[in-house]
Amino acid sequence: MDRRIRRARGIRAFGAILAGVALSAAALTACAGGADESPAHPFGPPPEASPGIHAWAVGEAGGLLVTADGGATWSRQRFYLSQRGVDVAFTDVATGWLVTDGGTVLATTDGGAEWAVVKQTDLAVKALAASSATCAWVVGSGAAAAGGDVATVLRTADGGATWRRTRFGMAQLTDVVFADDRHGLLLALDRIWSTTDGGRTWKLRKTVPMTVLTSVTMTDVRHAWVAGWDTQTGDPLVFTSRDGGVTWRALRLRVSPAGPGALQARQIAAAAGHLWVTCPAGVLASRDGGRSWELQQVPAGRPAAIAAADEAHVLATTETQPILASVDGGAVWLAFGRADFLERPLVAVAAVAGPAQ
């Protein structure tokens, strides 16, 4: 993040093992048909191998895709449930968490070779955050006693053995992030909360009417960014905080118009003063903490989820299934994959820089 906050965690035993069907980018892109039916790399070659750059992407039923070389080659891991991953988080190359559309929380301590179920929730899960092997947070909504749905944050401080619940009424929660075991931020469509006690208590810090706030990231306990868009204009919005979320300032994104809704911010990632925000038109990027911005073009797809292992290595998923990767902070993006390889687009990605093997 300067230490980049990834998301992830846990451990316990009952659930899920590996499948590492080693799948090179050629297998990932060539998929089912004969070699003469379509090119092996319909979007061009995959990135050059970057040993030690690990990433995990979810969205498929019962499994996820994983790379240990920055996206040059991929393998499949299985968690053996007929559910799709909704979010994934890793705090290092070994320790990770995953949540599914069935409300299941899983954890790994070996980089995803084996996954264990640590919690079956009653929530429609939206997001996941983690800071260590013991601490994780799950955001979603569940049925209220009086009818309707109530926004909820579940938290564990013992690797998933026990969980506590905090309710937020009718708020439409969208994302959560933690910089360490105590300092975190929580988003709703138009609100931002902060905590300094691991989520036991939350303080409402900012309300932004007529917005959709979609994503939050932190690089340490003080520096944070929130992305979203203005519901009246469709323009992208990025807010920054230098005091752990107590106060916020709007950043100006001076980029050329790209059509109605084309710049609506979806997800934000940060590393060492670099920022990336996905939008339908490409990736909005800053190399100076948000003072200046550019729209980075991508060769295929509409970027959705994004994660940065460091200031150079960034990976993103798309609506239309190609996976995007950059080894130079987004100056050049490469796309690889084939639409008939994945059943559905990948919806979340986590990335971590570890030692090269």
Model region roles, listed by residue range:
Residues 15-27:
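Bacterial N-terminal signal peptides
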Residues 29-357:
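Residue-level hotspots at or immediately adjacent to binding/recognition sites across diverse folds
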